[in-house]
């Protein structure tokens, strides 16, 4: 049974994690900051690890762009949850693909580990990330070769930062160019999509 928490920003809604992952204290989370390494505001994305620690979690950080396959596999295997930060979505997808971390994550989620995706981390959870071009630059990911297939953890696409002060207009533009067949789910920074098996709900802090 798949369990996911997909957010624009984790800090405002992190306390909602307990709805899909009870008894957080003492559990371990794999923290993947890779997307934030190619973002001018990456430091703020990485601050989520302090929120995770405040919830009682042990944080194991690993950058999949530079870590070995063995280290990534070991890190994920020893965790109860996987957290993927915001940042540049295209660089994140490229790194997940070339390190094979994406396959390891998808398998772990299928086996019951909870996936927490923030902004870029939420976008890559869907079937395809091409739509996020209106918000993110492809420049940091020259080896994607126009293959925008996401991890496919869910069958819908998150549009983060709707109504936000910085990226709200980009999010609105994505929605203007979408249609019902695209299965877009826009979320504000104070909202989260919680997936618990067949149950999917949009919640607010």
Feature map (PLM): residue ranges:
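N-terminal beta1-alpha1 cap of cysteine-dependent amidohydrolase-like domains
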Residues: 1-81, 85
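Patatin-like phospholipase A catalytic core
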Residues: 8-10, 191-192, 196-205
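Short glycine-rich anion-binding loops that position phosphate/pyrophosphate groups of nucleotides
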Residues: 37, 87-90, 121, 163
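Short, active-site-adjacent cap segments at secondary-structure transitions
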Residues: 90, 122-125, 192-194
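Class I SAM-dependent methyltransferase SAM-binding "motif I" and its flanking Rossmann-like core
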Residues: 94-95, 101-164
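Conserved anion/nucleotide-ligand pocket segment
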Residues: 149-197
């Amino acid at each position: 049974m798949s369990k996911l928490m997909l957010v624009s920003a984790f800090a405002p809604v992190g306390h909602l994690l307990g709805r899909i992952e009870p008894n957080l204290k003492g559990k371990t989370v794999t923290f993947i900051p890779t997307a934030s390494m190619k973002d001018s505001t990456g430091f703020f994305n990485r601050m989520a690890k302090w929120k995770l620690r405040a919830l009682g979690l042990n944080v194991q950080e690993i950058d999949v762009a530079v870590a070995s396959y063995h280290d990534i596999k070991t890190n994920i295997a020893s965790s109860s949850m996987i957290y993927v930060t915001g940042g540049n979505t295209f660089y994140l997808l490229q790194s997940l693909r070339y390190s094979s971390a994406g396959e390891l994550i998808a398998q772990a989620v299928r086996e019951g580990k909870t996936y927490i995706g923030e902004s870029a981390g939420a976008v890559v959870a869907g079937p395809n990330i091409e739509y996020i071009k209106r918000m993110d630059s492809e420049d940091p990911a020259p080896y994607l070769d126009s293959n925008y297939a996401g991890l496919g953890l869910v069958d819908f696409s998150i549009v983060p930062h709707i109504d936000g002060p910085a990226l709200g207009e980009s999010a609105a533009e994505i929605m203007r160019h979408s249609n019902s067949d695209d299965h877009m789910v826009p979320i504000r920074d104070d909202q989260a999509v919680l997936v618990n098996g067949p149950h999917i709900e949009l919640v607010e802090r």
